[in-house]
From Swiss-Prot:
This is Queuine tRNA-ribosyltransferase. InterPro entries: ArchSynthase1/Queuine_TRR, TGT, TGT-like_sf, tRNA_ribo_trans-like. GO terms for cellular component: cytosol. GO terms for molecular function: metal ion binding; tRNA-guanosine(34) queuine transglycosylase activity. The active site is at D89, D264. The keyword Metal-binding applies. Its EC number is 2.4.2.29. Substrate binds at D89, S90, G91, G92, F93, D143, Q187, G214. Residues 245-251, 269-273 are annotated as: RNA binding. Catalyzes the base-exchange of a guanine (G) residue with the queuine precursor 7-aminomethyl-7-deazaguanine (PreQ1) at position 34 (anticodon wobble position) in tRNAs with GU(N) anticodons (tRNA-Asp, -Asn, -His and -Tyr). Catalysis occurs through a double-displacement mechanism. The nucleophile active site attacks the C1' of nucleotide 34 to detach the guanine base from the RNA, forming a covalent enzyme-RNA intermediate. The proton acceptor active site deprotonates the incoming PreQ1, allowing a nucleophilic attack on the C1' of the ribose to form the product. It comes from Shewanella piezotolerans (strain WP3 / JCM 13877). Pathway: tRNA modification; tRNA-queuosine biosynthesis. Binds 1 zinc ion per subunit. NCBIfam families: Q_tRNA_tgt, tgt_general.
């Protein structure tokens, strides 16, 4: 992987990730394909929304279908018929989410399968092996997602163990002679000093990119912004910056303003299935009875298949009847909305009009433009 940085405006960056399987324009949003599929969508449909890269879930693909079946197909690209770049998370966040059915030790994580209750052990080495079998273009280190709230001492212990796991991930990745890219994950909770220590340790080990982890786990939005404002300028400028698991459209806008290059989140797909649709004027709740006889398009500024062909009344009808097509059309729209947002951000950075773009983004939804501190490096 090669990261090319074209231009900046403030801390916002316009560039691209160049892989053998294709180029990813940044800032980029990665749709989430947990089980090797973006729910309800064919790979071709996902590509048509403008996606250059997908995120796969190491933990779930390890449990089902497993490494053996994956290797029989070649890798995840062949298994799901997506011949463009794939980033896989390490499984650390999913283990974190298991709560009471997992036990974390220095060696790794003991837990019971959420599928059948079987006892399972996952450690940095195994995570690297699984991601190797998936053929991931971007592999994420195995880490512990520091919970919120956590005391500074708790966050320090968690972060320091994640650093040790980062070294083990690096060593196993190299032992496997994996030709792809490995990203480190910065932890440290809401404590700036711990974030500094984490980043320094990761840079000393050496990675192809750096993710900001442990955010969007319940902390106030102000804390997320503060950590990004503090951390992003310290990440080596020639490496991509990835904000994991974020988020709402405004989170992407605010992340880009603070120097983030990559995002992923289940929000556009999950919200689509629940009838919450993102538009240029805000969220439309298609289940609301006001849409029952509305012949207008969902968003007249959107060029997606759904908006070009169907009315709000039809989408309301499909949802009320629990038709699968409704969820599919909603998903197509939400994914295209996110990709159009990223296209707009990239274009605004290129032309030096990011401030105008941000103002229009918020005012078109009847919202105030949030203040951003003077961002000087």
């Amino acid at each position: 992987m090669k990261f090319e940085l074209d231009t900046t405006q403030g801390r916002a960056r316009r560039g691209r990730l160049v892989f053998e399987r294709g180029t990813v324009e940044t800032p980029a949003f990665m749709p989430v394909g947990t089980y090797g599929t973006v729910k309800g969508m064919t790979p071709e449909e996902v590509r048509e929304t403008g996606a250059d890269i997908l995120l796969g879930n190491t933990f779930h693909l390890w449990l089902r279908p497993g490494e053996e079946i994956m290797r029989k197909h070649g890798d995840l690209h062949d298994f799901m018929n997506w011949q463009r770049p794939i980033l896989t998370d390490s499984g650390g966040f999913q283990v974190f989410s298991l709560g009471d059915i997992r036990k974390i030790t220095e060696e790794g994580v003991h837990f019971r399968s959420p599928i059948n209750g079987e006892k399972i052990f996952l450690d940095p080495e195994k995570s690297m092996q699984i991601q190797d079998s998936l053929g991931s273009d971007v592999v994420m280190i195995f880490d512990e997602c520091t919970p919120y709230p956590a005391t500074e001492d708790e966050a320090r212990k968690s972060m320091q163990m994640s650093l040790r796991w980062a070294q083990r991930s690096r060593d196993e990745f190299d032992r496997l002679e994996n030709p792809n890219s490995l990203f480190g994950i910065i932890q440290g909770g809401v404590y700036e000093g711990l974030r500094d220590e984490s980043l320094k340790g990761l840079v000393d080990i050496g990675f192809d990119g750096y993710a900001v982890g442990g955010l969007a786990v319940g902390e106030p939005k102000e804390d997320m912004h503060r950590i990004l404002e503090h951390t992003c300028p310290q990440i080596p400028a020639d490496k991509p910056r990835y904000l994991m698991g974020v988020g709402k459209p405004e989170d992407l806008v605010e992340g880009v303003r603070r120097g983030v290059d990559m995002f992923d989140c289940v929000m556009p797909t999950r919200n689509a299935r629940n009838g919450h649709l993102f538009t240029s004027e805000g969220v439309v709740k298609i289940r609301n009875a006001r849409h029952r006889d509305d012949t207008s398009t969902l968003d007249d500024k959107c060029d997606c298949y759904t908006c070009k062909n169907y009315s709000r009344a039809y989408l309301y009808h499909l949802d009320r009847c629990n038709e699968i097509l409704g969820a599919r059309l909603n998903t197509i729209h939400n994914l295209r909305y996110y990709q159009r947002l990223m296209e707009g951000l990239r274009g605004a950075i290129e032309t030096g009009t990011l401030d105008d773009f941000v103002t229009e983004f918020y005012t078109s939804q009847g919202r105030e433009v949030p203040e951003v501190p003077e961002l000087t490096d």
